[in-house]
Amino acid sequence: MSSHAGHGHHEAPAPATPVHAHAHAHTHGPGGDPATDIDWDVLGPLLEQEAELNAAQYEEAARWIAALPTAPKVRRVLDVGSGPGVVSCLLAEVFPEAEVVAVDATPALLERAKNRARRLGVIDRFGTLEAELPEDFGRLGEADLIWAGNSLHHLGDQRAALAGFAGLLRPGGTVALVEGGLPTRRLPRDIGIGQPGLEARMGAAAATRFEHMRSELPGAKRETEDWSALFAAVGLVPQGTRSFLLDLPAPLSGPARDHVVASITREREVLGDLLTAEDSAVLDRLLDPEDREGLHHRPDVHLLAARTVHLGRRDTA
């Protein structure tokens, strides 16, 4: 299991975002995939930028958890699949008495997480753990809150992984799964070049790639993605589901536009042959900084997405 900062980034269970595209390829991609050789000095800032754009959603979700009448005092938090630690540090702010541990399989991202915690003044309650799940479940330690942001679906047996999380919870503790939601949209349906519906077709290609990734995971098992039922199956009490909206209308700020350009650049690379020649040509135009119809200049570029958080609680008895 690798990192997911936010992601970003669903036509199917997986959104077409750089976070997913990179993590899927890095951890599970076949040889020769252009995304398997990752420069974390390039990807790390992109992951941070994406998570920062979504920070308001994540903070709202964390405060929802903190305000639940059944919530125990949170003393230890595990952010599983933390990436560069944007959400980990946010959780440290929302739960000011808790130790927060960022868990990820990539040392370069954990170093970014640690540096971020230092900059934000939460390093005294912040730790990192390099771990690969499910092999390293026994190293995680117990927790009052386990945050799994778009990371569970990188484990072949999701039910067994949920049972593993349940076994780490202290009485009254909560698992927060960020899974599902709605696909990210950045362009109108008809952009005036190529066939209308470009992003929908990119989402379909991402869904195909996602299914291929899932099928190649060790111990992969198909599960109906009824998260409340899966919580109940592993002995947790479902505590509700909420979706949180990111809505940045046009015209975008410079940083948000830069992120859209960077994310679509990586999607163009990662989806590769799953796209038609016509759609690939349209993407080349969109990514050309000199093209007046491109992402660098279009007045209609926006950023709209919804992330869904599912909660399961361990009984206090």
Regions from the PLM with identified roles:
Residues 4, 221, 225, 237-317:
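Conserved Class I S-adenosyl-L-methionine
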Residues 37-59:
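Class I SAM-dependent methyltransferase Rossmann-like catalytic core
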Residues 55-73:
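Conserved alpha-helix/loop element of class I SAM-dependent methyltransferases that forms part
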Residues 176-252:
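Conserved catalytic/acceptor-binding region of the Class I
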